[in-house]
A protein has these predicted regions:
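Short loop/turn motifs at secondary-structure junctions
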Residues: 99-101, 195, 244, 329
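Short, acidic (Asp/Glu-rich) active-site segment that either coordinates a divalent metal cofactor
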Residues: 155, 168-221
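Glycine-/charge-enriched secondary-structure boundary and capping motifs
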Residues: 2-11, 26, 118-136, 149-154, ...
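Glycine-rich phosphate/pyrophosphate-binding loop regions near the starts of catalytic domains
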Residues: 33-186
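Glycine-rich beta-alpha junction loops
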Residues: 66, 162-165, 178, 185-189, ...
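Charge-biased, low-complexity intrinsically disordered regions
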Residues: 5, 10, 14-18, 112
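Intrinsically disordered, low-complexity, positively charged segments
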Residues: 15-45
Length: 346
């Protein structure tokens, strides 16, 4: 009778799993603060305590998201250390749009074959972004699916939980005359990658090691894997000022109009003025290479505005100053008007 391998259970490599856990421990612990009582690293669940006495009527806000098929670009390039930043940004920036400050984060990593080095790179990016956002990485799951996912490939998702005072949940008090301020996004972030891959890799057969566009000082691969900006830290700084924030929108799939419309009521419109911000060259290259209509580009991509903050006129300068302190550029891109609940670009 053949002696079974001690390292495999139903084709899942237990030894690789153990090695992965050891390699990620320091990264995970680097996100801990005094509120972490126990973590999923050694317990069945992560325990997190926060001082409710800081709040009058605290409300927990949770959001779950992934990185979509940007993971395929990371796999092709064999570069896994930054896409975890995209994951955290996708989640903490979502809950910041409700006014929430992130407390803790959970991740889920599914791979075709457990590779301890790859796992460490993935988690290192998550940990870096969690630390920047002020969220403790209190647990997660590593799952091996050899029959569903090819070796070297992965799927990545996560959940952020934060807290906000009940009377500060956004949106609120939105009114005609409010100013729409857009925060710059130097890259694509983590949405639209099915169209990106179809354009560059399937149709144009572009080399990821070639220039991103004519005269670019970065390769196409480097530009496509560029990590997302975290806007939650910017918003937390704005929330700490006397700026009167009426609404926020995280600009992901659906573009500016498709996301801003989510904060409107049936009596208000959002009018966004094209040409009021700088569009990064990568979007022009996508459109040229794929012969994509303007309307499609506006539906799929952020086109250089990754986040929107809507405030009354007397709060605009405060928002601009805080953005500058965080090395972000704030553009005045539109306004709220009386209407029927539409968001339009003109």
């Amino acid at each position: 009778m053949t002696e079974p391998s001690s390292g495999l259970t139903y084709a899942v490599d237990i030894e690789a799993a153990d090695a992965s856990v050891k390699r990620i421990q320091d990264h995970v612990r680097s996100t801990y603060n005094e509120n972490v009582l126990s973590s999923g690293e050694t317990s069945f669940g992560g325990c997190f305590a926060f001082d409710a006495k800081e709040f009058t009527n605290p409300v927990l806000v949770s959001g779950t998201d992934g990185v979509g098929t940007k993971s395929e670009i990371a796999s092709i390039m064999g570069k896994y250390d930054t896409i975890g930043i995209d994951l955290v940004a996708a989640n903490v920036d979502d809950i910041a749009a409700q006014g929430a400050r992130p407390l803790f984060f959970l991740d889920y990593i599914s791979v075709g074959k457990l590779d301890p080095e790859m796992m460490e790179q993935l988690v290192s990016g998550i940990a870096v972004a969690c630390a920047e956002a002020g969220a403790a990485l209190v647990g997660g799951e590593m799952s091996e699916h050899p029959e569903l996912i090819e070796p070297g490939h992965f799927d990545l998702s996560g959940t952020a939980t934060g807290v906000v005072e009940r009377d500060r949940i956004l949106p609120q008090r939105l009114s005609a005359g409010d100013v729409i301020i857009g925060f710059d996004s130097p890259g694509i972030r983590a949405n639209g990658y099915t169209l990106v891959r179809d354009t560059f890799l399937k149709k144009a057969k572009r080399d990821l090691n070639g220039p991103a566009w004519a005269g670019a000082d970065v390769t196409l691969g480097e530009e496509l894997i560029r990590p997302s900006v975290l806007y939650s830290p910017v918003m937390q700084s704005i929330f700490a000022t006397d700026a009167d924030v009426h609404a926020c929108a995280h600009i992901t799939g659906g573009g500016l109009a498709g996301n801003i419309v989510r904060v409107l009521n049936s009596e208000l419109d959002a009018t966004i003025s094209r040409g009021t911000w700088s569009i990064p060259e990568i979007f022009n290259e996508i459109q040229r290479e794929g012969n994509i209509a303007d309307s499609e580009m506006e539906k799929v991509f952020n086109l250089g505005i990754g986040y929107v903050c809507i405030v009354p006129e007397d709060s605009v300068s405060t928002v601009e100053e805080v953005c500058a302190e965080h090395n972000r550029t704030a553009f005045r891109i539109g306004e709220i008007t009386n209407g029927t609940g539409r968001a339009v670009l003109q």
